[in-house]
A protein has these predicted regions:
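Well-ordered, non-membrane alpha-helical segments in soluble/globular domains
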Residues: 247-250, 292-307, 336-343, 390-395, ...
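The substrate-binding groove and active-site-proximal loops of carbohydrate-active enzymes
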Residues: 273-298, 323-339, 375-395, 423-439, ...
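Glycan-recognition surfaces
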Residues: 365-379, 383-391, 395, 440-552, ...
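Carbohydrate-binding surface patches
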Residues: 573
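Glycine-rich, aromatic-flanked loop segments that form ligand/cofactor-binding clefts
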Residues: 253-279, 319, 339-378, 456-461, ...
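Active-site groove signature of glycoside hydrolases
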Residues: 312-324, 393-429
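Active-site-adjacent "subsite" loops/lids of carbohydrate-active enzymes
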Residues: 282-299, 341-346, 353-408, 419, ...
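Carbohydrate-recognition beta-sandwich/jelly-roll modules
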Residues: 4-8, 13-316, 412
Length: 573
């Protein structure tokens, strides 16, 4: 490796690390990976504000920033630029280069509400790039947008499948094997955004890019504020880029890994969830005129469990899905659907089956509108930070998990609809938290309270980010678009993303599409290769006819999987 820091005759500073090299000149720095220049980053980063009218106020540099200091110590070089802008009295840009990565930050001084951060936007034309394609670890709803995108196209992902995703891009260049990775890293309490976008700007004969967040006015500055950092490094491939991103979150102390003590046996499954059974029983004469959510009832689930016995199938966990409760906000069993939920749970315990309840986040059904927030689209959402809602959560969690008289004695939750997280400048929460941070606070509260009531309770949820690793027992791979015909490959890819984000967290392989026989059975029979097998229905449909032999085949796979888990757990113990 070349000398770590060199200065050329023309005043350029060159830092050479094992996976990358930067060349600092003026207010820009070239980034090289595998001896190829991937981009030239302009340190100027716009930090627009939100006006009282809830509109964006542009942030413009009034002069070029000047390189004020270059400091070297063992294994690290720090470059500091100083500038100012139309909105901020002072802006300080810092680039720290180490052996493993570089770390870039912008600190603003002044007053105002941050609308977003436009990293490397320069004077508005972005930063020049040579890479040709990018990868984002987030697939959009129903795969309308892929993980990969052309460098000439903007990339914004709003996903219901990974909430939140890892905020990291890796970029590839034609003819070069290695990749450049640029990831967003926020300190604890500073994830007050929803998105991390890649944007392209055409300028004259060229084009540039920048990276953007959406604080939407929910970060108030009265003095100084340092925006979330960008870390950069070279990577061998897409997975390597994400692994390094996750490693930084853990080793920096921002994120905590999951406690890897031996998990309760029932966490490993197999599992049965009734959601698609509810969907396919709509119109069934046995449940005349009942909607899909009205079918989350005792008669259907009792019949489902009885049908399991006929196939000699023995799940360790049963998930009662949407909508077993009277109201989403208060989570009390609907007496018109459940004569005695506790008695149902007790019967399952006697059979070795642990009952989990589907739990909808954010929905204001049954909650006081005065304690809710309104999105920019005019939709109402629960504010989970109010004392009133936290007290309501305490009551609901106790009622669901406790074995005390009058409680349900259930064994965990399937937390869903995390993507309902309220978005927009109009959202005003009691705590002032927003975006990822607001979701984190709610999920952390649920997790800690649940474990206090029942330490073995299983929390199944959807985050695909290391920040959430210690409050997620089992990550759900989520819905599969039945129009597709690659069930195994789709969910296998998601499984890789979740495992990279939260090492050691169990994977709920979730549902098959029940779209065609081949696509469905490929995934059902191979789920154990990825995670915990999960079956969503014990019947087929006209598009996907399933026979008794099919379910007996799944039963055989379940038995072999269960034996394997028991053997492995025996070896661990």
């Amino acid at each position: 490796m070349a000398k770590f820091l060199e200065k050329t005759a023309d005043g350029t500073y060159i830092v050479s690390a094992p996976s990358y090299r930067v060349a600092v000149h003026g207010h820009t720095f070239d980034v090289y990976v595998a001896e190829n220049r991937f981009c030239t980053l302009d340190v100027r980063t716009a930090v627009p504000q939100t006006s009282e009218a809830l509109e964006e106020i542009p942030d413009r540099e009034t002069r070029l920033p000047t390189l004020a200091d270059v400091a070297e110590k063992a294994g690290e070089v720090t470059f500091t630029w100083v500038g100012e802008s139309s909105l901020w009295e002072k802006k300080t840009y810092v680039l720290r280069c180490g052996f493993l990565r570089f770390n870039y930050t912008v600190t603003v001084a002044g007053h105002g509400n941050v609308d977003g951060v436009r990293y490397f936007a320069g004077e508005g034309n972005g930063s020049p790039y040579e890479f040709s394609e990018g990868f984002t670890p987030c697939v959009s709803w129903y795969n309308e947008e892929d993980y990969r995108f052309r460098a000439s196209m903007n990339c914004h992902r709003w996903s219901v499948l990974m909430v939140p995703p890892m905020f990291s891009y890796s970029f590839g260049m034609r003819g070069v094997g290695d990749r450049l990775s640029l990831g967003l890293v926020a300190e604890r309490g500073e994830h007050n955004f929803h998105a991390f976008d890649y944007r392209v700007v055409r300028n004259s004969w060229g084009s540039g890019f920048y990276l953007a967040t959406d604080q939407s006015g929910h970060t108030h500055v009265d003095g100084t504020w340092t925006a979330p950092a960008i870390i950069g490094y070279g990577a061998a491939n897409e997975d390597d880029a994400l692994r390094k991103y996750t490693d930084y979150y853990f080793t920096s102390g921002i994120a905590k890994p999951h406690d890897h003590r031996p998990f309760p046996r029932f966490w490993y499954g197999p599992m049965l969830c009734g959601w698609l059974e509810q969907a396919m029983r709509v119109g069934d004469p046995a449940f005349a005129n009942l909607t899909i959510t009205e079918l989350a009832r005792e008669e259907l689930y009792e019949a489902l469990v009885g049908k399991l016995a006929g196939y000699d199938m023995h799940p360790t966990a049963l998930i009662i899905d949407d909508k077993w409760q009277s109201h989403y906000a208060t989570d009390e069993a609907d007496p018109t659907k459940w004569k005695d939920l506790r008695a149902f749970v007790d019967r399952r315990h006697a059979e070795g089956i642990h009952t989990m309840l589907w739990f909808k986040l954010w929905d204001p059904d049954g909650w006081d509108p005065a304690l809710c927030v309104t999105t920019d689209n005019g939709e109402m959402r629960i504010d989970p930070s109010t004392p009133e809602f936290l007290a309501n959560l305490d009551r609901a969690l106790y009622r669901i998990l406790s074995a005390d008289a009058g409680c349900y004695d259930c064994d965990g939750f399937k937390l869903d609809f995390a993507f309902y997280n309220p978005i927009g400048r109009r959202v005003k929460t009691h705590s002032g938290k927003y975006g990822v941070e607001l979701l984190y606070d709610m999920m952390a509260y649920i997790y800690k309270k649940a474990k206090k009531i029942k330490p073995d309770a299983l929390v199944n949820c959807s985050p695909c980010h290391p920040y959430f690793a210690h409050i997620c027992d089992q990550a759900r791979l989520h819905d599969y678009d039945p129009k597709n015909r690659d069930n195994r490959e789709d969910l296998e890819m998601r499984g890789r993303m979740f495992s990279l984000a939260m090492p050691g967290v169990l994977l709920d392989t979730d549902n098959s599409g029940f779209n065609t026989h081949r696509d469905t059975m490929r995934w059902q029979m191979d789920q154990a290769m990825i995670g915990v097998p999960d079956l969503y229905a014990l019947m087929g449909n006209e598009s996907c006819p399933l026979t008794d032999e099919d379910f007996l085949a799944i039963s055989a796979m379940w038995k072999e999987y269960a034996r394997k888990i028991d053997l492995l757990r025996g070896m661990e113990q």
